[in-house]
Amino acid sequence: YAIGMTISAFMLYASLECTGNYSSLLHVVSVCVDKANAILELDTMDIDGKEIQPENYDIRLSDVTFSYDKRKIIDGVSLSIPEKTTTAIVGPSGGGKSTLCNLIARFWDVDSGEVTLGGVNVKEYSMNSLMNNFAFVFQSVYLFADTIENNIKFGRQDASHEEVVEAAKKACCHEFISKLPNGYNTVIGEGGATLSGGEKQRISIARAIMKDAPIIILDEATANVDPENEKELVEAVDALTKEKTIIMIAHRLKTVRHADQIVVVEKGQIVQ
């Protein structure tokens, strides 16, 4: 009888322990479902535009406003970015620099005003035809858990190995890739975990070179690079931006001193 009671007690304890574990799991699932529902309830963008080849790559923002969570982020901004020029956007953190770039590339839609590319409102482009005109190099680089070659070819899937190598040379990353045990076939970890910050950034630039888009958006691309890698990274950026329309977000004066125009953004407005 005592043995039976002991076994029953252990079985009851195990059941209660499982119930407690499942209770925690259900809470996590509930939170995830709530977050998913919040995303699904957001208004969706109309991305069914026309296949448009712009006549030029002039960019114009006309009296643009944008709010997020009922807070005005961009307030009545007008700006002209002529084709094949470099525009540097500077200002304090949270001032609206990255938001302006996101609106230009139509990651978000403006609340009022308009953004045009080649004289055509970006809303009239299909998403694919609009994105064909842009390449991006962000401060936070995301690389896939795949070979280095496939990460570079993400900019153009049909590229040959020779074209990948050429892009890597221009981005100053061919040398360190060649020293890896499997070269361009080396598989890197999720997010490029096995590479340094400078190495990841140069692979990101090689990817953008491979795409060969006419407009390049550089979002603080050299902000977190150590001094040893900065020279090579600057050379890589120079190779990427030749004969392109450049929009550059930066904190340091020396990275923008060669810009054709410098725009100071503060509290969602152009102040200089």
Language model segments and positions:
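Short gly/ser/thr-rich secondary-structure transition/capping motifs
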Residues: 42-46, 117-120
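Flexible, glycine-biased helix-capping/connector loops in cytosolic signal-transduction modules
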Residues: 14, 42-45, 182
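Conserved E/DxxT/N motif and adjacent residues on the DHp alpha2 helix
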Residues: 38-41, 45, 153
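Cytosolic ends of transmembrane helices, especially the final helix of ABC transmembrane type-1 domains
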Residues: 11-39
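Membrane-water interface of transmembrane alpha-helices in multipass transporters/channels
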Residues: 1-7
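Conserved catalytic core of two-component sensor histidine kinases
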Residues: 6, 13, 131
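Pre-NBD coupling/linker segments of ABC/ABC-like ATPases
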Residues: 44-54
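ABC-type nucleotide-binding domain
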Residues: 54-272
